[in-house]
Amino acid sequence: CRGFLWKGRRDVQGGHCLVAWDQVCTPKEIGGLGIPNLRLLNAALRARWPWLERTDPHRPWNEFNLQVSCESLGIYRAATHCVLGDGESARFWTDWWLWDGRIEELMPNLYAFVRKPARLKTVRQAMVEGWWQDISPDMTTRALLEFIALVDRMQDVDLTPGTEDRIHWAWDSTGQFSAKSAYMACFAGRIEANGATQIWRSRAPATCKVFAWLAARNRCWTADRLQRRHLPHPSACPFCDQAQETIDHLLLGCVFARQVWSCITNAWGKPSWMPTAHATLGQWWTALTPQRQLRKEIWTVVTLVAWTIWRHRNDIVFNGASPSAEVVLRRIDEEGQDWRAAGLLREHGSLPRRVVRLDSGE
């Protein structure tokens, strides 16, 4: 899969891969391509087994005692808690039925002295038979302090006869297990990538979206990245011949790119959207505030402009073309009409019918 993505063949070398595979296999919102991470997806799917074992114990396969990996079991345990009823199914020591966690986690020193056969007792069994009788007598001082704390907590526990215990899945609004919520929880805590929403919710073709994704991650083969790898590279930006070529300079900060963006933002009637000389693509793109009904239209045009500037750069570097803002604007206009004909840009709306008004011809 990695070889097909980067080179269209089975085998590739590390230098062909512009982004590490574990980063590619993350959700688009946090900077990946949304390709499933099979290891995490497998763990998320297998978390369904302990869920069904507790919520539907009459399934035929339950008697086979299927082994669940620690990773899947960890997902299940992190996502579930018990709503206590009659205490017939909630496990006293290992289930999350107290308001703030599991006894085994809240009181690990005490739990270490609980006899193993008793660790699977239900809340009702533990309360009727005396949960303190399941603890070895030679407790440490810390375990004894936790024992006293548990005695105090148990004073407020009341069972509700006739009401079954209920296991709740915290990561889904329905309270029921879903593989998607289990999988997405594996990425919880990661920061949303700048520009991710704008890139992937635009209507641009997939090729252009992937380019914008690489550009936002600074993974295009510009001179700065080639230089770090001691590879042949242009000595300066092929547009202005004044600064080192970086992807942000090339697409936004260069005087050439700013000339193009000036025409675009003026055509929109939004000159304040003009990128600064030191802007980064993801941050600048995220900071744009179009009206809700125009967001996808604006995001699509931004992708088109960046894609066209990049192609013109490649014409200069590889084909010996001369820098020309007029050529870039004309190509934006021509390709924009093709995108409009394909339904990627609206025919009617607040944007001009042509993607950009050329300064020199119209």
Residue ranges of model-derived segments:
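A helix-boundary/hinge signal
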Residues: 1-362
